[in-house]
Structure formats: C-alpha cells, structure tokens
C-alpha cells in the first residue's frame, strides 16, 4: 500500500485501463479544442466594429492591450488584420487599429504627438510634418473618455478614420499611413510591449 501511494499517478492501473483513459483524454482534447476556438472566434466576431467588417472583409482579430504611461491609463487598443498579415511587412497589409480612449485629449495634441512618434521610424522634413499635422487636425476630433477612434491602413493608398463608428475623413498618402501605423506596429515604436501585445500570434 505504501509503495502504491508513493508511485506516480496511474502507474498502479492495469495497462488496458491506462490505454483506455489515454484514448478518452485524447478524444476529449479533440472535441474541446475546436469548441474553444469556435467560442473565441464567435466572441471576436461579436465585438467586431461595423466599420471594420465593412472596410476590411475577412478581418482577423489579432491582439489587444492597454497603454499606460507613468501609471496613467491612456487608451485600450485592438488590432484586426487582413488574411496573410505578416508583422515585419505590416505596411504591405490591410489592418484596422481601434483606440478607445480613457482620458481626454485635444486633436492638436494628438496630431503633434503622432508626428513625434512617426519620426522614430523615418526622417520627416519640417514642411512634410506641418502638412501631415494639418491633415490629422482636419480628421481627428477632440477626444473625451470612452471615445473610440479607428484607423484603417490601406496599403499603397493611405489611411481612413472613423470616430465612434462614423467616418471622419482620410489621408491619401501611403507614406503617411506607413509611418502613422508604425507608431504601434513598427519595430522602432516607443512602446515595444504594446507592439508585442498587438502582434501576438502574427506571422513574422
């Protein structure tokens, strides 16, 4: 009795019963895995913004995260991507990034900060920065807590934006779109942990 109690679990069972239990566990895993995957996909589909469903057919949910800076909660971010998306070539794929803000920000401040972050990935001339900043201020509204801003990256075309589900404009400049979405998706981002969370599971 003492030896049996100390033995690893299952070692005292007859071989035929052990085999039967292993088969049952395997069958259970095969049944549960597709179910769990289906539930996860259904939950993701249920929260898919209508503008994403319309603008990016077959969008696949990727990652989500919350940005905190010095303890302050800034926004929640969610990313959807087109089939075949690759992290290292994010600028070649369609993607939708949603930011649900947790604090208030002026449109001018968002635009100015965006230029600062975009400069981490490329040199931007003062004239180009001024033009893009003006374009962003034209498109972006002032933000209140719980407001939702969503951007769609259109490779080779530019970027379109929605505010609380309503279209607010687009910036038809592929270079702008690449650098703007690079704020979150480029290896040069100032928030590598956020990038990793958004791109979790993405092919490289």
Tell where the protein language model's regions lie, with residue ranges.
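Hydrophobic alpha-helical elements and their junctions with loops/disorder across both membrane
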Residues: 9-12, 31-32, 36
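Intrinsic low-complexity/disordered segments
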Residues: 3, 15, 28, 38-40
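Terminal leader/tail segments of proteins
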Residues: 39-204
């Amino acid at each position: 009795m003492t030896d049996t109690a100390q033995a690893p679990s299952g070692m005292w069972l007859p071989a035929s019963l052990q085999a039967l239990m292993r088969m049952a566990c395997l069958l259970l895993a095969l049944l549960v895995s597709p179910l769990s995957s289906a539930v996860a996909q259904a939950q993701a589909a249920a929260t898919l913004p209508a503008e994403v469903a319309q603008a990016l057919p077959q969008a696949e949910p990727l990652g989500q995260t919350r940005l905190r800076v010095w303890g302050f909660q800034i926004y929640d971010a969610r990313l959807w991507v087109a089939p075949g998306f690759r992290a290292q070539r994010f600028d070649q794929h369609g993607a939708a990034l949603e930011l649900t803000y947790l604090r208030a920000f002026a449109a001018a401040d968002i635009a100015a900060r965006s230029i600062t972050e975009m400069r981490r990935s490329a040199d931007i001339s003062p004239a180009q920065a001024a033009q893009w900043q003006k374009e962003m201020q034209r498109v972006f509204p002032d933000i209140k807590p719980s407001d939702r801003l969503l951007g769609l990256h259109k490779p080779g075309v530019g970027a379109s934006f929605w505010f609380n589900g309503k279209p607010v404009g687009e910036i038809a400049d592929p270079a702008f779109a690449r650098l703007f979405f690079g704020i979150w998706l480029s290896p040069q981002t100032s928030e590598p942990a956020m990038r990793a969370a958004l791109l979790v599971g993405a092919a490289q």
